[in-house]
A protein has these predicted regions:
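Helix-capping/helix-break motifs at membrane-protein junctions
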Residues: 132-133
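A short glycine-rich, Lys/Arg-flanked "PGG" loop and its adjoining helix->strand segment in the class I
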Residues: 137-149
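Short catalytic micro-motifs in class I SAM-dependent methyltransferases
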Residues: 126-127
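Conserved acidic residues
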Residues: 57, 78, 120
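Class I (Rossmann-like) S-adenosyl-L-methionine-dependent methyltransferase catalytic domain
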Residues: 1-52, 66-101, 107-113, 154-246
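A conserved beta-strand element that flanks and buttresses the S-adenosyl-L-methionine
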Residues: 123
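Conserved class I S-adenosyl-L-methionine
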Residues: 56-65
Length: 246
């Protein structure tokens, strides 16, 4: 397999995106408890700091989710733009970081109004699986336009076709054991089996990528790309790619 494919048959993309945005815009059980949610976002923020090019960098985190520890990234750069498609998420971000001078929150359509070639780094973590290939191509064109020459896109947590449910569960339980919420994680796995996330994943599907297919997609969009040695976040079976604007 050398191309992107959904884990089910092709879906109508507009309802698919509306379904996923609605899920993230509402209360959900994707995190088993507050501890899980906190350490999840802290781990991501700490991983992202390694990609920061320097203290004068302007950075966009697109599809950032609740980004509880975005301040850890903002503290080592000049400017951090947080963007998410879910209005409720954006409102929480605005409230959480209202007093942080380096952080601003924008809707996706506001991101597209940013001046060309003004960003040093774009972060796009754990989002590609919710988009069709065409939708990802459109966003890659936006990111290419916004990045300075030599600027980088970090596309993280990409799900490969060979990624199994067992591998995902194992990664979660290891992360939970290391961070003190193992019992809650075990109970959460039972809830997830009957959750809206499982229902939506069955109905709408996820888009999966082989390593070579993602590199080819990034290079076709105008980037020089390679797979990073480690993935962002807790799941080592997923993939992170680093793409530099040519």
């Amino acid at each position: 397999m050398n191309s992107a494919e959904p884990d089910r048959s092709q879906h109508d993309n507009a309802p698919r995106m509306r379904g996923w945005v609605s899920f993230w815009n509402s209360e959900n059980s994707i995190y088993v408890n507050a501890r899980h949610r906190d350490v999840h976002f802290r781990a991501i923020a700490d991983d992202l700091r390694a990609y920061v090019p320097g203290p004068q960098a302007s950075v966009l985190d697109y599809g950032c989710g609740d980004a509880l520890h975005a301040d850890r990234v903002a503290d080592v750069i000049f400017r951090l733009i947080l963007s998410d498609a879910a209005p409720a998420v954006r409102e929480r971000l605005r409230q959480r970081f209202a007093s942080h001078a380096k952080i601003e929150v924008r809707a996706p359509e506001e991101v597209e109004a940013i001046a060309d070639a003004t960003l040093d780094l774009v972060i796009f973590n754990s989002v590609a699986q919710y988009l069709s290939g065409d939708e990802l191509d459109r966003l890659l064109a936006v990111f290419l336009r916004l990045l300075k020459p030599g600027g980088r896109l970090v596309l993280g947590d990409v799900v490969p076709p060979a990624h199994s449910t067992v591998a995902a569960i194992t990664a979660l339980l290891r992360f939970a054991a290391h961070n003190g919420f193992l019992l809650a994680a075990l109970a959460g796995l039972v809830r997830t089996a009957f959750s809206d996330y499982r229902r939506l994943r069955t109905q709408l599907g996820l888009t999966l990528y082989e390593e070579g297919a993602m590199i080819a997609k990034l290079e076709a969009a105008g980037f020089s790309a390679h797979r990073a040695r480690t993935n962002i976040g807790h799941n080592p079976a997923r993939m992170t790619f680093v793409a530099e604007r040519r």
